[in-house]
């Protein structure tokens, strides 16, 4: 079940299932390398580009109303500047049918939301045809 984590992740608020995610497919892609979580957060803090007040509430409202707008990850900017293949992967996913493509957490795993699991499987095959078999990938139904 979905939850909202706040603080340093220690405050967990269970949420009702989101209408926007019902029946969607999810593709996870790990490109074969990791990103240091402490480094990612330090780079974000140094940039000063974080902490959009009300953003989480707006995303929860959109998802509950059946919309996917507003999904974002502020850690993408510093991580993408160092690991330049990640924005290429994100763009590929968006250009090949993902409803939403984002980095998960501090990276390096990327994810794509699709209309259904079959679309996620097709996108997975296209990804591996284009980028090869390095890393791992998985699909699930939401």
Question: Predicted segments — roles?
Answer:
Residues 108:
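Glycine-rich GHKL/ HATPase_c ATP-binding element in histidine kinases
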Residues 111-113:
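Short hydrophobic/aromatic beta-strand micro-patches
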């Amino acid at each position: 079940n979905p939850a909202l984590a706040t603080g340093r992740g220690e405050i967990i608020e269970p949420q009702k299932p989101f209408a926007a995610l019902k029946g969607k497919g999810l593709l996870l892609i790990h490109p074969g390398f990791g990103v240091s979580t402490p480094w990612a957060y330090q780079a974000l803090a140094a940039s000063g580009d974080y902490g959009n007040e009300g953003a989480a509430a707006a995303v929860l409202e959109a998802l509950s109303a059946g919309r996917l707008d507003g999904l974002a990850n502020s850690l993408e900017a510093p991580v993408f500047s160092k690991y330049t293949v990640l924005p290429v992967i994100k763009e590929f996913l968006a250009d090949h049918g993902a409803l939403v493509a984002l980095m998960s957490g501090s990276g390096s795993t990327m994810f794509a939301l699709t209309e259904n699991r079959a679309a996620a499987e097709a996108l997975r095959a296209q990804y591996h045809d284009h980028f090869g078999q390095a890393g791992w990938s998985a699909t699930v139904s939401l």
